[in-house]
Every structure is written in structure tokens, then in C-alpha cells.
């Protein structure tokens, strides 16, 4: 063992973390490479060989896809989580899941350090490190992109490319096409390079999870999605009878259907927690279908006033996830409250997936608050129309008083 001890590096096999692996060895650390299989398209055995060739003492490949869906994506679906009204939080949800396993490995291997390749300007450094400090405060974090001896040596990607050539590090990225991609089961993100100019449109061929909606099939897929306690438990393709009921298989199937129809693309400028705006392009196929389907069954089954409170909690949940506070007491509290709100969110939603869109076709539930007789225009039911007169009069009092004062002020 070297003098500085062992460090568990969150390793992707890409340019940054490959260079960081070699650099950490230069600094005197024994490097344990940790690859999280979280649903990305990756040759993990090839990545293992690469890490060992670059000098990793050990390599751990951990499949965390199932726990990612059940413990992180499902709470986000229950909460209808959107950051700044558009972002479904694919990367934000993955980071605490990845970091949790990294901490487990560090504790198991007796490593005093963990490390990551997140930049000093982004959100991921915060998400990784807040998770580490929450779960294992005794473990120290090595963040090369915040260390002067690293970032002064590597001013940008070209310096990393040169370093890679010098040390025999094979990397697929070239200076001509250097935008960053980050993929997991839920989504893929694209940023940096020519995308940093928010005016530039996404280059042809950039998207990898979804078909161009204009080239998508000319007939839709009709799906029935069943929910219990706000969580999808079964999906059925009405056309061909395909059915999936385990969390991971269900999610993968929805990714396939949504991707085929070009569902889930967004191009946004968002506010990073650290204080700057950034441009990101995202594909979130299955997450987009489930967002719309869950929203529909929730509105069908949940009391109006409870839902108003829950919507506020959902906004807070999205903010906490985005800013890295998954393991905070307030986020645990919010998740608990949202789970409570979902106890009666049960039923089936029929959707059409077609050329980039998700259309709600119908819904049914044994726990619905919808009363067809009460709302009918043809049946009076347990409702006296004359009662609406008093209801309107009472609600108009506040408006009358407000405008009486406004008229008095204007008259002056």
C-alpha cells in the first residue's frame, strides 16, 4: 500500500475520470475504481480492463439500476417532481444513488478517501459530496477539479487530451466533438462544447435515446399504466398485449416505447445551485410518460386541498433533489409527507404515445373522488343549484371590498 492510502474513485471510463485515475496514482494514492451500472450503455468489462491497465488496484462494477428505480425514481414520480417547471431531474436523482454505493465500498475496503470527476462549476460536486458527508463524515473527498495543482495543470479538455496521449489513455472524445454526455436509466444529458452557446441548435445526430419525432412511426402505441400508492405497478400495451410488472422491466419497456416515438426531449437553460445559468439538452423518455400518467391519476383520486399542499411539497422536493440534499432531514420529511399523500392514488390510466407527445385517453380507479352522477348536467343528484347563489355571494364580498377601495383611491 502507498503512503497516502486508498481512494475510491467514481469512474466512468471517460476522459476526465481516466486522467484523474492516473493523476491520483501520481499523487501517491492506491486507486479503487468504482463503476456504477445505472442503466447507461457501457461495455463494463472493457471499462474494467481499462481501469486495471491504468493502474487501479481494484475495480468494482455495481449494478444499482433496480434500487435507482425503486428508491429514487419512484419517489420523484410520486411527487411529480420538476425543477424550474421543465427538468425531470434525471442526473440529480442518480447522483445520491451512485454516491451511496461509493461510500459503501469505501467503508467495506477501509478507504479513507473518495473522489469524483465533477467540475468545480457544476451541481454534481455538491450532490456527491453532501451524500458522502451525510453517510460517512469521516471519509474525506478528493475533488481534483477544485484543487489548484490539478486545474492549473489542466486548463481544459485539450490539456486532458494531451495528458491522455502521454499516458496511453484511450479516449473516444476528440476536440472536434467535445460536448459532455451523461447517461443513466432515466435520461441522458448533453452539455458543453458548442452547446454552451444557447443560440446554437442541437447538432443532427446528437440525440441517442429518442427517435426524431418527425421520423417516428405513423401509428401510436396505446398503453395502460396501473398505479398503486402513486407508483406504477403494471404496464400493458393495448395493441400487442405486452405486459410488464416489475419496476425495472416496466421502466425499461416505457423507455423503449417512448424512445421509438421521440418522447422526452427538452432543451433548456436552468439555474445551477452554485449560482450560474447553464444550458442542458435532456432526453427522459419513460419519465415523461410516467409524469403525465401519474399527474392524471393523482388529480382523479386526490382531494383538492390535499393536492394543493402536495404540489407545494413536490416543488420543494424537486429543489432539494436538484441541490443535492437528498439525505437531509427536510428531504426525508417531504418524502414521507408525499408518500402519505399517495396512499389513495390508485387506478389505471390509458395513454397514447405518438410523435413526441403523450396523450391521456382515459382513466379508472376504485378510489376515485369523481362522482359521475353529482357532476352530470342531466341528473341533479345530491346538489341544489340554488345553493350556488349564496356561495357566489359570499365569495364576491372580498372582491367587492377590494374594488370599492380601489375606486376610492382612484377617485382621489
Curated annotation (Swiss-Prot):
Keywords: Acetylation, Amino-acid biosynthesis, Arginine biosynthesis, ATP-binding, Cytoplasm, Ligase, Nucleotide-binding, Phosphoprotein, Urea cycle. The keyword Acetylation applies. Signal peptide: none annotated. It is found in: Cytoplasm, Cytosol. Its EC number is 6.3.4.5. GO terms for cellular component: cytoplasm; cytosol. CDD domains: ASS (cd01999). Acetylated by CLOCK in a circadian manner which negatively regulates its enzyme activity. Deacetylated by histone deacetylases. L-citrulline binds at residues 87, 92, 123, 127, 180, 189, 270, 282. The modification Phosphoserine is found at residues 180, 219. Pfam families: Arginosuc_syn_C, Arginosuc_synth. One of its GO terms (molecular function) is argininosuccinate synthase activity. The keyword Plastid does not apply. Pathway: Amino-acid biosynthesis; L-arginine biosynthesis; L-arginine from L-ornithine and carbamoyl phosphate: step 2/3; Nitrogen metabolism; urea cycle; (N(omega)-L-arginino)succinate from L-aspartate and L-citrulline: step 1/1. Homotetramer. Interacts with NMRAL1. Interacts with CLOCK; in a circadian manner. Forms tissue-specific complexes with ASL, SLC7A1, HSP90AA1 and nitric oxide synthase NOS1, NOS2 or NOS3; the complex regulates cell-autonomous L-arginine synthesis and citrulline recycling while channeling extracellular L-arginine to nitric oxide synthesis pathway. It is linked to Defects in ASS1 are the cause of a bovine form of citrullinemia. One of the enzymes of the urea cycle, the metabolic pathway transforming neurotoxic amonia produced by protein catabolism into inocuous urea in the liver of ureotelic animals. Catalyzes the formation of arginosuccinate from aspartate, citrulline and ATP and together with ASL it is responsible for the biosynthesis of arginine in most body tissues. Belongs to the argininosuccinate synthase family. Type 1 subfamily. This is Argininosuccinate synthase. It comes from Bos taurus (Bovine).
Amino acid at each position: 500500500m502507498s503512503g497516502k492510502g486508498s481512494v475510491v474513485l467514481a469512474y466512468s471510463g471517460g476522459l476526465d475520470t481516466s486522467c484523474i485515475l492516473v493523476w491520483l496514482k501520481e499523487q501517491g494514492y492506491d486507486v479503487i475504481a468504482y463503476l456504477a451500472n445505472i442503466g447507461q450503455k457501457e461495455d463494463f468489462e472493457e471499462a474494467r480492463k481499462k481501469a486495471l491497465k491504468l493502474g487501479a488496484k481494484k475495480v468494482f462494477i455495481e449494478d444499482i439500476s433496480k434500487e435507482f428505480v425503486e428508491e429514487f425514481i419512484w419517489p420523484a414520480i410520486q411527487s411529480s417532481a420538476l425543477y424550474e417547471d421543465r427538468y425531470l431531474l434525471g442526473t440529480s436523482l442518480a447522483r445520491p444513488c451512485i454516491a451511496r454505493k461509493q461510500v459503501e465500498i469505501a467503508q467495506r475496503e477501509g478507504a479513507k478517501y473518495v473522489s469524483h470527476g465533477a467540475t468545480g462549476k457544476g451541481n454534481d460536486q455538491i450532490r456527491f459530496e453532501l451524500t458522502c458527508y451525510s453517510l460517512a463524515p469521516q471519509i474525506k473527498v478528493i475533488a481534483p477539479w477544485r484543487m489548484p495543482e490539478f486545474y492549473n495543470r489542466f486548463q481544459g479538455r485539450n490539456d486532458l487530451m494531451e495528458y491522455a496521449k502521454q499516458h496511453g489513455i484511450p479516449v473516444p472524445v476528440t476536440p472536434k466533438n467535445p460536448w459532455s454526455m451523461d447517461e443513466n436509466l432515466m435520461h441522458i444529458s448533453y452539455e458543453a462544447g458548442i452547446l454552451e452557446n444557447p443560440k446554437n441548435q442541437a447538432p443532427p445526430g446528437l440525440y441517442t435515446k429518442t427517435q426524431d419525432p418527425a421520423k417516428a412511426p405513423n401509428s401510436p402505441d396505446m398503453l395502460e399504466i396501473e398505479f398503486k400508492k402513486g407508483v406504477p405497478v403494471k404496464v400493458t400495451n393495448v395493441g400487442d398485449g405486452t405486459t410488464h410488472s416489475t419496476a425495472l422491466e416496466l421502466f425499461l419497456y416505457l423507455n423503449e416505447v417512448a424512445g421509438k416515438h421521440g418522447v422526452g426531449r427538452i432543451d433548456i437553460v436552468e439555474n445551477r445551485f452554485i449560482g450560474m445559468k447553464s444550458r442542458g439538452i435532456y432526453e427522459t423518455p419513460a419519465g415523461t410518460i410516467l409524469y403525465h400518467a401519474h399527474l392524471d391519476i393523482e388529480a382523479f383520486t386526490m382531494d383538492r386541498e390535499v393536492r394543493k399542499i402536495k404540489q407545494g411539497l413536490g416543488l420543494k422536493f424537486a429543489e432539494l433533489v436538484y441541490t443535492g440534499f437528498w439525505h437531509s432531514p427536510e428531504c426525508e420529511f417531504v418524502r414521507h409527507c408525499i408518500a402519505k399523500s399517495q396512499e389513495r392514488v390508485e387506478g389505471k390510466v390509458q395513454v397514447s404515445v405518438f410523435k413526441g407527445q403523450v396523450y391521456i385517453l382515459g382513466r379508472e380507479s376504485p378510489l376515485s373522488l369523481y362522482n359521475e352522477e353529482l357532476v352530470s348536467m342531466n341528473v341533479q343528484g345530491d346538489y341544489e343549484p340554488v345553493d350556488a347563489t349564496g356561495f357566489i355571494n359570499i365569495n364576491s364580498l372580498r372582491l367587492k371590498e377590494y374594488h370599492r377601495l380601489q375606486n376610492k383611491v382612484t377617485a382621489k
